Protein backbone atom coordinates (compact mmCIF):
# COMPACT_ATOMS: atom_id res chain seq x y z
CA UNK A 1 0.00 0.00 0.00
CA UNK A 2 2.84 2.41 0.83
CA UNK A 3 4.33 2.06 -2.67
CA UNK A 4 1.08 2.32 -4.60
CA UNK A 5 0.49 4.77 -7.44
CA UNK A 6 -1.99 3.41 -9.98
CA UNK A 7 -3.94 1.36 -9.07
CA UNK A 8 -4.51 2.31 -5.43
CA UNK A 9 -5.53 -0.05 -2.63
CA UNK A 10 -7.65 0.94 0.36
CA UNK A 11 -8.80 -0.97 3.44
CA UNK A 12 -12.25 0.10 4.66
CA UNK A 13 -13.61 -1.05 8.02
CA UNK A 14 -17.26 -2.09 7.74
CA UNK A 15 -19.68 -3.75 10.14
CA UNK A 16 -18.48 -7.32 10.49
CA UNK A 17 -15.83 -7.25 7.78
CA UNK A 18 -12.98 -5.31 6.16
CA UNK A 19 -13.45 -4.22 2.56
CA UNK A 20 -10.42 -4.27 0.25
CA UNK A 21 -10.95 -1.76 -2.54
CA UNK A 22 -8.72 -1.52 -5.63
CA UNK A 23 -9.09 1.55 -7.82
CA UNK A 24 -7.44 2.06 -11.20
CA UNK A 25 -7.40 5.07 -13.51
CA UNK A 26 -7.25 4.55 -17.28
CA UNK A 27 -8.75 5.85 -20.51
CA UNK A 28 -10.94 2.78 -21.01
CA UNK A 29 -12.62 0.18 -18.81
CA UNK A 30 -10.56 -2.54 -20.43
CA UNK A 31 -7.31 -0.73 -19.70
CA UNK A 32 -8.35 -0.18 -16.09
CA UNK A 33 -9.17 -3.87 -15.71
CA UNK A 34 -5.72 -4.80 -17.02
CA UNK A 35 -4.19 -2.64 -14.30
CA UNK A 36 -6.41 -4.21 -11.64
CA UNK A 37 -5.95 -7.88 -12.51
CA UNK A 38 -2.36 -8.40 -11.24
CA UNK A 39 -3.17 -6.78 -7.89
CA UNK A 40 -6.40 -8.71 -7.59
CA UNK A 41 -4.42 -11.94 -8.02
CA UNK A 42 -1.81 -10.90 -5.43
CA UNK A 43 -4.44 -9.99 -2.83
CA UNK A 44 -6.37 -13.23 -3.38
CA UNK A 45 -3.17 -15.26 -3.04
CA UNK A 46 -2.15 -13.56 0.21
CA UNK A 47 -5.55 -13.58 1.89
CA UNK A 48 -6.59 -17.04 0.70
CA UNK A 49 -9.71 -18.40 2.41
CA UNK A 50 -10.05 -15.20 4.46
CA UNK A 51 -11.54 -13.54 1.39
CA UNK A 52 -15.31 -13.50 1.78
CA UNK A 53 -16.92 -12.51 -1.50
CA UNK A 54 -17.29 -9.96 -4.27
CA UNK A 55 -18.95 -6.98 -2.56
CA UNK A 56 -20.65 -5.87 -5.77
CA UNK A 57 -23.06 -8.76 -5.12
CA UNK A 58 -24.98 -9.00 -1.83
CA UNK A 59 -24.35 -11.91 0.53
CA UNK A 60 -27.92 -13.13 0.12
CA UNK A 61 -27.54 -13.14 -3.67
CA UNK A 62 -24.19 -14.90 -3.45
CA UNK A 63 -25.58 -17.58 -1.16
CA UNK A 64 -28.72 -17.94 -3.27
CA UNK A 65 -26.70 -18.51 -6.43
CA UNK A 66 -24.60 -21.09 -4.63
CA UNK A 67 -27.66 -22.98 -3.39
CA UNK A 68 -29.29 -22.90 -6.82
CA UNK A 69 -26.12 -24.11 -8.50
CA UNK A 70 -25.99 -27.24 -6.36
CA UNK A 71 -29.79 -27.69 -6.23
CA UNK A 72 -29.81 -27.35 -2.44
CA UNK A 73 -32.27 -25.94 0.09
CA UNK A 74 -31.99 -24.12 3.40
CA UNK A 75 -34.10 -23.47 6.50
CA UNK A 76 -33.55 -21.21 9.52
CA UNK A 77 -34.00 -21.18 13.29
CA UNK A 78 -33.78 -17.70 14.78
CA UNK A 79 -33.84 -16.41 18.31
CA UNK A 80 -32.11 -13.03 18.72
CA UNK A 81 -32.52 -12.11 15.03
CA UNK A 82 -36.25 -13.01 15.11
CA UNK A 83 -36.72 -13.41 11.37
CA UNK A 84 -34.03 -11.13 9.94
CA UNK A 85 -32.08 -14.04 8.42
CA UNK A 86 -35.21 -15.19 6.62
CA UNK A 87 -35.88 -11.63 5.51
CA UNK A 88 -32.42 -11.34 3.97
CA UNK A 89 -32.84 -14.64 2.15
CA UNK A 90 -36.22 -13.64 0.76
CA UNK A 91 -34.95 -10.25 -0.41
CA UNK A 92 -33.79 -12.17 -3.47
CA UNK A 93 -36.34 -12.80 -6.20
CA UNK A 94 -36.79 -16.53 -6.74
CA UNK A 95 -35.58 -17.45 -3.25
CA UNK A 96 -38.55 -19.81 -2.86
CA UNK A 97 -36.53 -22.21 -5.00
CA UNK A 98 -34.11 -22.81 -2.12
CA UNK A 99 -35.45 -21.19 1.10
CA UNK A 100 -38.07 -23.46 2.62
CA UNK A 101 -38.88 -21.40 5.72
CA UNK A 102 -37.87 -20.83 9.30
CA UNK A 103 -38.78 -21.04 12.96
CA UNK A 104 -38.59 -17.95 15.17
CA UNK A 105 -37.81 -19.71 18.44
CA UNK A 106 -37.57 -16.72 20.73
CA UNK A 107 -38.60 -18.68 23.83
CA UNK A 108 -36.90 -21.73 25.27
CA UNK A 109 -40.25 -23.50 25.14
CA UNK A 110 -40.38 -23.22 21.34
CA UNK A 111 -36.72 -24.21 21.08
CA UNK A 112 -37.61 -27.37 22.96
CA UNK A 113 -41.07 -28.21 21.58
CA UNK A 114 -40.64 -27.25 17.91
CA UNK A 115 -36.92 -27.61 17.27
CA UNK A 116 -36.31 -30.50 19.65
CA UNK A 117 -33.58 -28.86 21.71
CA UNK A 118 -33.26 -31.05 24.83
CA UNK A 119 -34.56 -29.36 27.98
CA UNK A 120 -31.56 -30.51 30.01
CA UNK A 121 -29.27 -28.87 27.44
CA UNK A 122 -31.12 -25.57 27.83
CA UNK A 123 -30.98 -25.89 31.62
CA UNK A 124 -27.28 -26.76 31.67
CA UNK A 125 -25.79 -24.44 29.06
CA UNK A 126 -28.44 -21.76 28.58
CA UNK A 127 -30.06 -20.66 25.34
CA UNK A 128 -27.03 -18.63 24.27
CA UNK A 129 -24.49 -21.42 23.89
CA UNK A 130 -22.64 -23.48 21.32
CA UNK A 131 -24.60 -26.59 22.21
CA UNK A 132 -28.02 -24.97 21.78
CA UNK A 133 -27.02 -23.19 18.55
CA UNK A 134 -26.06 -26.55 17.04
CA UNK A 135 -29.22 -28.25 18.26
CA UNK A 136 -31.39 -25.43 16.90
CA UNK A 137 -29.81 -25.75 13.46
CA UNK A 138 -30.24 -29.51 13.45
CA UNK A 139 -33.87 -29.12 14.49
CA UNK A 140 -34.53 -26.58 11.74
CA UNK A 141 -33.04 -28.91 9.16
CA UNK A 142 -35.38 -31.69 10.28
CA UNK A 143 -38.46 -29.46 10.37
CA UNK A 144 -37.70 -27.90 6.99
CA UNK A 145 -36.38 -31.12 5.43
CA UNK A 146 -33.58 -29.13 3.84
CA UNK A 147 -30.00 -29.64 2.74
CA UNK A 148 -28.69 -26.97 5.12
CA UNK A 149 -29.93 -25.02 8.12
CA UNK A 150 -28.60 -22.12 10.15
CA UNK A 151 -29.46 -20.85 13.63
CA UNK A 152 -28.88 -17.71 15.67
CA UNK A 153 -29.06 -17.32 19.44
CA UNK A 154 -27.63 -14.37 21.32
CA UNK A 155 -28.01 -11.33 23.54
CA UNK A 156 -28.91 -8.25 21.52
CA UNK A 157 -29.33 -5.97 24.54
CA UNK A 158 -29.50 -3.43 25.87
CA UNK A 159 -30.18 -5.59 28.94
CA UNK A 160 -29.70 -9.27 29.67
CA UNK A 161 -25.92 -9.42 29.50
CA UNK A 162 -23.59 -10.86 32.14
CA UNK A 163 -19.83 -11.03 32.58
CA UNK A 164 -19.87 -14.54 31.16
CA UNK A 165 -22.34 -13.75 28.39
CA UNK A 166 -22.19 -10.03 27.56
CA UNK A 167 -24.51 -8.05 25.31
CA UNK A 168 -23.44 -8.69 21.73
CA UNK A 169 -22.58 -12.36 22.22
CA UNK A 170 -24.14 -14.44 19.45
CA UNK A 171 -23.78 -18.13 18.68
CA UNK A 172 -24.49 -19.51 15.21
CA UNK A 173 -25.14 -23.10 14.25
CA UNK A 174 -24.79 -24.43 10.72
CA UNK A 175 -25.65 -27.97 9.71
CA UNK A 176 -25.71 -29.95 6.49
CA UNK A 177 -24.14 -32.94 4.76
CA UNK A 178 -20.74 -32.19 6.34
CA UNK A 179 -21.95 -32.28 9.94
CA UNK A 180 -22.77 -29.50 12.37
CA UNK A 181 -20.52 -26.59 13.32
CA UNK A 182 -20.89 -23.53 15.55
CA UNK A 183 -19.45 -20.03 15.37
CA UNK A 184 -19.19 -17.42 18.10
CA UNK A 185 -19.23 -13.65 17.57
CA UNK A 186 -19.02 -10.71 19.94
CA UNK A 187 -20.81 -7.91 18.13
CA UNK A 188 -20.97 -4.21 19.01
CA UNK A 189 -23.53 -1.47 18.55
CA UNK A 190 -27.11 -0.94 19.64
CA UNK A 191 -29.77 -3.64 19.60
CA UNK A 192 -30.62 -3.24 15.93
CA UNK A 193 -26.94 -3.10 14.93
CA UNK A 194 -26.27 -6.38 16.71
CA UNK A 195 -29.32 -8.09 15.24
CA UNK A 196 -28.57 -6.93 11.70
CA UNK A 197 -24.90 -7.88 11.93
CA UNK A 198 -25.87 -11.30 13.29
CA UNK A 199 -28.28 -11.91 10.42
CA UNK A 200 -25.63 -11.01 7.85
CA UNK A 201 -23.02 -13.17 9.59
CA UNK A 202 -25.42 -16.12 9.60
CA UNK A 203 -25.55 -16.06 5.80
CA UNK A 204 -21.77 -15.74 5.60
CA UNK A 205 -21.27 -18.77 7.85
CA UNK A 206 -23.61 -20.85 5.69
CA UNK A 207 -21.73 -19.73 2.59
CA UNK A 208 -18.34 -20.70 4.04
CA UNK A 209 -19.77 -24.01 5.28
CA UNK A 210 -20.87 -24.85 1.74
CA UNK A 211 -17.80 -23.61 -0.10
CA UNK A 212 -15.27 -24.98 2.42
CA UNK A 213 -17.09 -28.27 2.99
CA UNK A 214 -18.16 -27.97 6.59
CA UNK A 215 -15.92 -25.28 8.08
Whereabouts are the PLM-identified features?
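Short beta-strand-to-loop capping motifs
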Residues: 22-26
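Short alpha-helical segments enriched in small residues
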Residues: 31-215
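Accessory alpha-helical/coil subdomains and C-terminal extensions
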Residues: 1-16, 21, 31-36
Amino acid sequence: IKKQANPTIALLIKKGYIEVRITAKAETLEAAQELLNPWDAIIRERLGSRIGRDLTISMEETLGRTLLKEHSTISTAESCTSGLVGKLLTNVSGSSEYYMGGVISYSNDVKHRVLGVPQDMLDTYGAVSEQVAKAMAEGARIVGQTTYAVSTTGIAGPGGGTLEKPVGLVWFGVTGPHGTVAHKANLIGNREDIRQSAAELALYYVYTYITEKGK
